């Protein structure tokens, strides 16, 4: 099996997906704009061949790369990046090279938030009222319908980038004057607990792994400067599982991981926020592994190579992420965190700057069967030396 992996060097942990593919006998073909010498040794060992392009945004260069691979190795069977940023590029390449998976015709429903809402509606899943607005009158008409506050976000976007909370008419006026030249969708603000239904689907559309994240605060608050913390729950609420499984069918997810976001509203009901056809960001895959004592990287590779996999998800542990941001006066320095909470820590590392606004410049991962104990530790890690406490 010939598998092309776009940007296998970033995010850094992606090399493990390539390594597991190679272990299962796949021919792994990497394409990126980094020099071969800059790739970590484990990635170089996993790749059968590497093709460097001047810029991954240069589609003609990518076509030449896949043409080269086809000439050298035969038909390309799969292409992936497991990275939201490159999903549309993957889809276009699949179309042009007749590769199975999301293609140019189907990618819109999982990239455009307005298209997602139409699928939510057809599946009978509640979601925030929203509308793509291309003019000031259209934006004001929508606000008159739902009232402030509203959330403005790119119709096609990644994470919380270029997302704004508009609380009044002054905010709306400023947004309309300064917004980027792209389609924006305005949504009524939903309140409640942010959580997710995540997993892996095999080639026939069967869910073979599930998990759920619970966020300690909204991602938009983290982007504004607050410290993010979230955890992998040991139990998935039945209604969350039912709605999540319904959306897997509605979006016809196959042979890939997924990350569906919801609000648990104050009345206990669920409302869909958005879907992502990839694993959650940061080090969440590693957190899945620690929470379940599994190897998700291998599970994904088995789905690609063999069509399915078996994953034991007993969820014996909660797994908590506690991020810290550069320049904040934390009560405990790094060594203090290790000394005080070392028994609960399974990993810690500095994060790439691109992830810092949402999840922090440095992250600590804690594991254990007692969520209250882990939450107390996360609060201690993020506690500031000033009376303000956790931000």
Task: Give residue spans per PLM region.
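ATP-dependent carboxylate/phosphate-activation module, predominantly the ATP-grasp catalytic core
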Residues: 188-253, 257, 264, 276-304, ...
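ATP-binding N-terminal substructure of ATP-dependent carboxylate-amine bond-forming enzymes
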Residues: 1-106, 137, 369-390
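Conserved protein kinase catalytic/activation segment
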Residues: 268-270
């Amino acid at each position: 099996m010939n598998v092309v992996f776009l940007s296998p060097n970033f995010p850094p942990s992606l090399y493990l997906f390539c390594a597991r593919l190679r272990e299962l006998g796949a021919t792994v073909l990497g394409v990126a704009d980094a020099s071969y010498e800059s790739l970590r040794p484990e990635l170089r060992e996993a790749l059968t061949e590497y093709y460097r392009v001047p810029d991954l945004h240069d589609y003609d260069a990518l076509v030449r790369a896949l043409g080269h691979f086809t000439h050298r190795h035969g038909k390309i069977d799969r292409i992936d990046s497991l990275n939201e940023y490159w999903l549309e590029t993957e889809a276009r390449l699949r179309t042009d090279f007749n590769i199975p998976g999301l293609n140019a015709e189907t990618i819109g429903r999982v990239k455009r938030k307005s298209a997602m809402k139409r699928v939510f509606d057809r599946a009978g899943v509640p979601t925030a009222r929203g509308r793509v607005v291309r003019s000031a009158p259209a934006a004001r008409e929508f606000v008159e319908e739902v009232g402030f506050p509203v959330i403005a976000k790119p119709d096609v976007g990644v994470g919380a980038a270029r997302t704004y909370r508009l609380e009044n008419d002054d905010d709306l006026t400023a947004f309309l004057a300064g917004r980027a030249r792209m389609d924006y969708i305005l949504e009524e603000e939903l309140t409640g607990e942010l959580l997710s239904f995540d997993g892996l689907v095999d080639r026939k559309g069967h869910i073979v792994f599930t998990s759920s994240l619970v966020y300690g605060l909204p991602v938009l608050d983290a982007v504004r400067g607050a410290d993010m913390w979230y955890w992998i729950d040991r139990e998935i609420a039945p209604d969350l599982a039912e709605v999540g499984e319904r959306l897997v069918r509605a979006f016809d997810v196959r042979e890939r991981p997924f990350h569906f976001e919801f609000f648990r509203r104050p009345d206990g009901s669920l409302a869909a926020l958005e879907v992502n056809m990839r694993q959650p960001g940061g080090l969440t895959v590693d957190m899945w592994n620690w929470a379940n004592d599994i190897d998700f990287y291998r599970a994904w590779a088995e789905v690609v190579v063999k069509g399915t996999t078996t994953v034991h998800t007993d969820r014996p542990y909660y797994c908590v992420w506690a991020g810290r941001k550069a320049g904040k006066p934390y009560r405990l320095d790094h060594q203090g965190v290790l000394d005080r909470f070392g028994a609960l820590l399974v990993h810690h590392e500095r994060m790439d700057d691109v992830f810092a606004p949402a999840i922090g410049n440095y992250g600590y991962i804690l594991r254990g069967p007692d969520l209250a104990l882990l939450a107390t530790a996360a609060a201690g890690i993020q506690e500031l030396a000033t009376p303000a406490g956790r931000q």
